[in-house]
């Protein structure tokens, strides 16, 4: 575990795997790199696995100003340069998938594969946008915050109470600035549905049929493009 320019990351597995490219994991909104601990444990004997906490989440320092998903894509490349990774796969979950797609579009010569988990290429519909803005504006009210957390836990984490307890504490610690700036980056993202048609590298799309956050139809449309 280490830091690069206030961005926390972990680096596990062989530095020079048997012909396999390194994989950089990018977590979703509200989450941090700990969400991939089981994947790290399973894959690290064969693959080099790098996980980073995006700006403001996990152990990365809080972003004091607004940023875009492309800024996080730039963070990925800076980390890859620091680790001397010429080519690599990016695995992104939900918002992490939004970032992975944009990193691929901006740095085509560096990204050799994508894994998109519970993600989509299109922007959110108006109802979802308004719900997110309500979350952002209401986060300073502790009662509303706690109510939002309890609603989101089964949607994002599932029914495991031990996992819920861990993330409940983490989410409750996020201040307004973290939520506001990350939410701004996610909700103001550009439309890339036409651009992704030009992605030629291998892409693995993984999506749960009962995903409540992003419907599986979004993954079907992503795969079709």
Residue ranges and their predicted role:
Residues 70-88:
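Conserved acidic catalytic loop of the alpha/beta-hydrolase fold
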Residues 199, 205-207, 211:
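Short beta-strand/loop motif that positions the catalytic acidic residue
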Residues 27-29, 88, 92-97, 208:
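Conserved alpha/beta-hydrolase "nucleophile elbow" surrounding the catalytic nucleophile
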Residues 53, 89, 112-115, 197:
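Residue in the alpha/beta-hydrolase core beta-strand immediately N-terminal to the catalytic nucleophile
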Residues 212-218:
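Conserved alpha/beta-hydrolase "acid-adjacent" motif
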Residues 98-106, 110-142:
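Flexible "cap/lid" loop of the alpha/beta hydrolase fold
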Residues 8-65, 79:
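Conserved HGGG/HGGXW glycine-rich cap/lid loop of the alpha/beta-hydrolase fold
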Residues 124-130, 143-197:
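Conserved alpha/beta-hydrolase catalytic His-Asp/Glu region
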């Amino acid at each position: 575990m280490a830091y690069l320019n206030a961005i926390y990351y972990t680096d596990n597995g062989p530095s020079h795997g048997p012909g396999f490219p390194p994989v950089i994991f990018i977590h979703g909104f509200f989450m941090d790199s700990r969400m991939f601990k089981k994947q790290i444990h399973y894959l690290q004997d064969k693959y080099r696995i790098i996980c980073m906490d995006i700006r403001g989440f996990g152990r990365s320092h809080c972003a004091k100003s607004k940023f875009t998903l492309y800024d996080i894509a730039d963070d990925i490349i800076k980390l890859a340069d620091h680790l001397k990774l010429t080519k690599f796969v990016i695995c992104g979950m939900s918002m992490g998938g939004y970032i992975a797609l944009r990193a691929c579009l901006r740095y085509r010569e560096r990204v050799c594969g994508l894994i998109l988990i519970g993600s989509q290429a299109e922007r959110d519909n108006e109802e979802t946008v308004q719900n997110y803005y309500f979350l952002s504006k209401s986060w300073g009210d502790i009662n509303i915050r706690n109510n939002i957390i309890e609603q989101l836990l089964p949607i994002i984490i599932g029914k495991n109470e031990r996992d819920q307890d861990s993330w409940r504490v983490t989410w409750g610690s996020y201040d307004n600035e973290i939520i506001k700036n990350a939410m701004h980056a996610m909700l103001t993202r550009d439309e890339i549905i036409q651009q992704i048609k030009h992605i030629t590298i291998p892409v693995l799309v993984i999506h749960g049929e009962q995903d409540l956050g992003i419907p599986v139809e979004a993954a079907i449309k992503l795969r079709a493009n």
